[in-house]
Structure formats: C-alpha cells, structure tokens
Amino acid sequence: MTTDRRFAAFSKNAQPPRMRSVPEGGMCISAFLVISRKGEPGSILMGRINKNAGWDHIGAVNQKNLERFASGWMLPSSHLILFETPEGAARRILREQLGIRNQALEGPLTFADTSGTSNHWDLGFIFKGERESAPSSPAWEKLTFVNVADLREEEMVRHQVDVLAYAGKFPTK
C-alpha cells in the first residue's frame, strides 16, 4: 500500500519527502543545564538574565521575550544552533553563559511539550551536573543556587518548572 501521508521525520534525504514545514505555532529545540550545588540536590543554579548581555546571540531570547524572561528565574539554556548537537549546545551554554570550560555533565534526558492554541512544539535536552560554587558571568544580573522547592511556578521563566520536573528536581503536582 502506498500512502500520501507526510510523517514528521526530519531528514535531508528522506524518501519519500516527509515534513515540508513546521507546526503553525513553531518548533523550538533547546538544551537546558540543571546544575545542582554539590551535596545539595535541591539547590539548582539559576539566574536572572542581564538584558544587555546579547541574549539574542547566547540564548536565542528575542527582544519580545527579553523583558519577560529578565523578571524570572531561568536555567542556563538556549535553542540549538542549526545543525548543532545537543551536547555541543550544552558545551556552548557552559562557555557563553557561564564562562565555564570544564564541567562534567550527564545526559541528555529528553522531553517534549506542546503549548498554546497555535500548536507550538518544544523538544528539550536536559544535561545535569554538580558544582561547589556558582560561577560569575556578565550574562546574568544574578546567578546563584536556588532551592527550587521554595520557588513558585510564576517566579520562573516559561517551561523551567517542566524542565526541573523532568530532571527530578521539582515536585510534580
């Protein structure tokens, strides 16, 4: 039997051709770092972004979302650059957002989510690690270990609760 369905398989050479466009609401492929303080698994490295740090380049945060993202706690994260591997994105986030060149990471864990009425798809890769102290970086107004059990969902940037829950760091409701 032959089908005219176009399955959501992304490949340069798929035969027959598969997906020719993205979902109406868009699709984001991102990497997230969930770094806990050594010996304190509930204390996670999060920050409030510095709006003047070029987040359109280092984290794929567009001008529209910059204000909203600056007001909440956010994990070090970014969309993947076209053809970048999830592991490559995690290493780039370490360098560009945290100024770290050598950090052990486990992962990735993967998660998928849809949001909004416009059928937006999110595919995320989560990398976990541990550190004894928070780095200092000009990308962040504030970068510190936060006890996530003390945070309310509305204090975090969009999807951070989901990422932390998938990583086993946030109690699910």
Model segments located where?
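Active-site segment of metal-dependent pyrophosphate-handling enzymes
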Residues: 91, 95-133
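NUDIX/MutT-family hydrolases
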Residues: 71-73, 126-128, 134-171
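N-terminal strand-loop-strand
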Residues: 2-74, 102-103
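Structural detector for helix-capping/boundary residues
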Residues: 78, 92, 96, 146-149
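Short histidine-centered catalytic/ligand-binding loop motif
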Residues: 73-84
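Conserved acetyl-CoA-binding loop-helix of GNAT-fold acetyltransferases
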Residues: 85-91
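Glycine-/small-residue-rich active-site loops that bind phosphorylated ligands and cofactors
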Residues: 27, 81-82, 151-152
